[in-house]
Amino acid sequence: MSGMGIAILCIVRTKIYRITISFDYSTLMSPFFLFLMMPTTLKDGYRMNSQVNEDAIGINLDLSLPTHISPTTGSESASGSNASTLRNDGNALDGGLLRTSAAISAPTGTSQPTETIGEKLSNEERVNSNVSASNSTTAGTGRMLSQSLTNDSPSNEISTDQLKIFQRMDEMSARMIEMEESFNKLSNKIAEQNTMVLNLKQDNYKVMNKLNILLKLVAQPSARPSTNNAQNKLAIELLNSISAVSSAYLQKMQNNGSGRQHTADLCTGDSNTHSGINQHRTTNGTIDVNTNTAQLNNQFSNALNTILPDQQHNRNNVSQNINQSLPNRQLGPVINTQANQNQSQVLIHNTNTHQQVNRSPISFPNASTDKPFKLNPNGIKRRRRNTQSNNNASTNDHASAAQKPISALSPLTNSHNSTTSMNYTNSSIHSGVTSASNSFHDLNSLNNFGTTTALSLPSLALDNASFPPNQNVIPPIINNTQQPLSFSQLINQDSTTSELLPSGKSGVNTNIVNRNRASTLPSYPKPMTVKSNVDDDGYQEDDDDDGDDEGDGRDNEEDSTAEEDEVDDEIETDMKNASINKRRRSLHHKKSNSLNGRRKLHGESATKPNINSDLHYRILKAPTDVKTIWEEYDTGIRGKPSIKHLEAKYGNKWRLNKNKKTFSRRKRLYKFILNGMERGKTAQEMIETLENKRLYKDDEDGEVKKRTIGWLQESLAGI
């Protein structure tokens, strides 16, 4: 037990002194306190002889106020029991305090203080003092000590050390509170920063996901627009337009031909033909294909027998008989699926006609069906000259050519060597029908749509014949699974088929126009009358009218395109114009170069002006960009007149011979830009649209390249 204290009240001469003694358990058990607890021994025999100051009582205790606390090493009692405070109404004692040399030590040294106290007591006995005063004082002191031990509470006074300790503890408490607050603030900041870090991580994750998505989109190669879709769309639109025209035409022909059935039956002159016709009409088109083919072969044989003896006098009658002897063209000679099955019947029914055909002085053009059509995979339109056999096919003038028998008979009369010419295929008949316009050799794939057969048969009397066709026509529907036509095939067949559509009862299409005879090509031994379809704004969509044919696909370099265009467009009408243009080209080769490094050919002389120089203007060949083409059309290049000015001033006269094919291709670009300008866009925007359409990404090396102007013109063929 530490920290125990005893308050001793000392009464000296009416002054009360309170002595506070701090001690521990070891001090309490010392002989000194035992001595204090025994007042009777002092009363009986002991006398104190010391001189006591009136202001102090010597009780052999160190009661002075300590100025410094020096703790004893290894002892807890020495550090806490040396402080005693003596006060007298706030004033210090006058005579000083008696100090004893005895120090209260640890419990291990209790014997030594006992001896010292005994010696001092023996010395005090020798002092001469008043016995009564000594006894009374001693007795009073003992009573006060006993009363203080029993009645007094612990001291209310606080020592300086305790005060310092309390102050230090208050400071430490304040510091601890401040540290706690700081720690709380720090923990809150850490929590906030942790939350912020988590939010930033989430935001970063979201942003990274978005960036990854964008990078994937950017890294993916730009999907080129599929040309097949555009081709299919164009094919569907083309066939829809053809079907609409053909449906209206066939409906009209059926209505007009319903009143002529009786007359057609009377003009045939063949009982077997009458029975076949009646059977077909009663069964609503369910006649057998083999029987119908045999009947048609007999009819053609009779027609040939009628034609061969006297062609010039009997041509009109024979043509009328042939048209009337074909009452039902639904299952005519254009049936392709039954061609091989009916070949033997064709040979049987036409055995007697081969010698007559060989004796025929008429020369029909070859309709070869063995030549396959190869489409250029790049979609660039290529043209070839007709073969020498086609050049030698016709030797008469325009008048005799207009009066020739129908070209549909050419598959029957085209055989001088074998019987294979009697094979009735759709391609051979159709190529014979459309040989004047030089269309494709093989059009079997159009049977998928059921319109070509219906349109090819009425054209038998429209190409060169002078008599109206039989208008009793029922449109057939033949499902033949052939390979569909390509992009450029459908364009040309649209133009070719539209030439064969008559309008009204006259049997002549009002859209078919005869071009100027000066536009016929002098390179052929026989001049050819050119027919073409003219659209609403007056330019020819099909420019195969100068005897060119689709050839094998070649490379789509601009050089080859430019060479073919120049060869096709620079054919002169006579040798004089050819020599003049040759001199002009040589002069321009020496003086000027084109924008793309190629030398251009112009019709204007470099030495002297020509009055009709505008009529001899040549369109710029093989330009590298759309802007140059538009400048040539709108404002003109290098002082030359613009194409728009030439069209407004001369019409089509300036492009009859040289520029007709090039202009027909360029017209697609002109129309595209003009249509955009009508919708509120500028010419520059439309030019940029066309230039962007040329861009594509190469699959091999991944480079972005530009397609040719020829490809761009072909892609706008539907405009």
From Swiss-Prot:
Arranged from A to Z, the UniProt key words for this protein are:
Activator, Nucleus, Phosphoprotein, Transcription, Transcription regulation
Q: InterPro entries under this entry?
A: HOT1 (IPR052146), TF_GCR1-like (IPR022210)
Ligase recorded as keyword? no
Q: Where is the composition biased (Acidic residues)?
A: 535-572
Composition skew (Basic and acidic residues), residue ranges: 117-127
The chain residues annotated with the modification Phosphoserine are S146, S153
Function recorded in the entry: Required for a complete transcriptional response to osmotic stress, through recruitment of HOG1 followed by pol II recruitment to the promoters of GPD1 and other HOG-dependent genes.
User: What is the additional note?
Assistant: Present with 149 molecules/cell in log phase SD medium.
Q: Under which name does UniProt file this protein?
A: High-osmolarity-induced transcription protein 1
